[in-house]
Amino acid sequence: MKKIEFNLLEEPWIRVRTPDCALQEVSLTDALLHAHEYAGLAGELPTQDVAVLRLLLAVLQTIFYRVDLEGSPSPLTDEEDALDRWGQLWEEKRLPEKPILDYLTAWRERFWLFHPERPFYQVLEAQIGTEYDAKKLNGEISESRNKDRLFQSYGGTEKDSLTYGQAARWLLYLNGFDDTSAKPKGKGLPSVGAGWLGKIGLFLARGNTLAETLLLNMVLLKDGQELWAPPCPYWELDQPRSGERTEIPLPDNQAALLTLQSRRIFLYREEGRVTGYRLLGGDFFERENSFCEQMTIWRKSQEKRNAPLVYLPLRHDPAKQLWREFPSAFAVESSTHTPGVVRWIAALRDYMDRHLFIQFESVGAAYGDKDFFVNDTFTDTLTFHRAVLDTTNTETRNKITQEVLFCEEIAEAVGDLAKEVAKSAGGQGVPETARARFYFAIDQPFRRWLASLDPEEDMDEAVLSWRSQAKGIARQVGKALVEEAGPSALVGRCEKIKKGNKEIKYHAAPKAFNHFLWELKKIYEEKGGNKV
């Protein structure tokens, strides 16, 4: 029997970034106790950081649902109690030592990466699962197989095996973002799809320190409204589930969800390094209306006209900037389900400085071929005044949403212009490329405008100023498309269109550009309600 090795509470394995941008590896205990000293997590991929963050959040949720800041037993009893406890933690700006050490000391034996009976985030039954080498465990290498790389991040021994610290980080990532390549061992088992974190559009808040990030995402109230059931993280189970592809009820507490075992995994080691692993499908639940998940954007789904409306987690589009998802993430309409973390932060308005800037981040993995492999990972951020989320500022969010929708309409008009200009030169335009060009041009200006908004100031004036800027950017992009088309597009060409009687349509860049300007005017004057 191999020896017990590598306790995650004591050994360094979590990668953090200091304020001066230095990287360190620290233990789970140190990551929590010194979280106020770190700028944030700094793993190999943003998806890995989210997996580690959720583990840390599960620990904090469990502790502070049960005890106060001094470590004395004090279970949360109502919503006001939860908000007050969070407010006390936020005011401290650091996580209290005693309750954290008391809890981790009590559960130390459940945090061994290698253990003959209870290896962390693993089960012995997975030894019959699909076999993979260390390169597959390393998400950085696995993901990079789908790209041409001039310079490899790993080579030699580092490519064929992992340190225990690396393996621990990638173990969490694998549990959350694993693809669908593993073959089931049992017969007639359901398809579980990608790991839970790979199925959703991850959406979280970022603070100035790791401690702030943890507190902002420590959602003590479901959707900012009601208490969860008592916490029960995976490691507290008397007997962890080990069955292959097991459907479970929706978790009723955050600790259980944050430590969901989407996969059954068993790591193999040799001479102090991890050389491979075996894997089976693990726990899963229905995605429909799975509102226990607080860190995702949602989309409405209604398959039939009279069928009940349901919500599904919305995966992020890697080609879509986060500000373009503002309507889904922050909308006011009752028919839209905003992310739980957004509702939670809105509920904290009395405990936070209204002038505080909040940064939200989207994180995702882009899969290929029915989630059979990971093509890429991506992240994006969005920053604005916390006061924008107040219930008294619904009109502000409505105005921002409207401007996002106007930008989408402009992008469509730019695409139509590109197609028409190309026809004027005798070619076939690619509207998608032109739309992407417009979004690139307007991306940073929109972010700056959003960050500058203060709900206490004149929003109508801010909106008019933005519309003037957006219209100018659109004109510049449109003008560039016309100029790049060349002289032949200015002269134009005739196209015969067969619709009943013969009809001839004339294509010319000047004509197309004038129509484009008319479209801009129609978007902002007819639909916007104010002239620019």
Model-derived features: positions:
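Extended alpha-helical scaffolding segments
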Residues: 1-146, 173, 178-532
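Beta-strand elements of modular eukaryotic interaction domains
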Residues: 151-153
